[in-house]
Amino acid sequence: MLRFGTVMVAAMLLATGAARGHEAEPPPKKETPAVPIKFSETRRGRVLADSRGMTLYYFDRDDTGNKSTCDGKCTEKWIPLVAADDAKALGDYTVIVRSDKSRMWAYRYRPLYTSHDDTAPGDTNGLDPENLWHIARPAN
């Protein structure tokens, strides 16, 4: 009878796969968002914002041909929205390579920046008196 019970337990283990030695599959990897840009409501209306909620801006002197002209001292006030090495374009969001070989995000081929003057999510203090910097807004 003991032998019959042992055979039955072994058969049940085989039937359920428990005796195969398989471990549970690891949980799926958490994927980081493909594009670290979201929409945010501010006192100036709906804007594009980075993952922290900081308003994004674009520069009139950047042409829309995948080039940033804000280098050197300019980046002390206007911080490029950095793209990871493995970042991929998605829809209206593209990745451009800067003159220093770093990568940054662009929206509709316009490079995106945050402003040093914005200190909290939703701030829109980055507009300049020369009207060269503009708040980036989602397309309608």
Predicted regions located by residue number:
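Compact beta-sheet-dominated domain cores in extracellular/mature segments
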Residues: R3, R20-N140
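Bacterial N-terminal signal peptides
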Residues: G5-T16
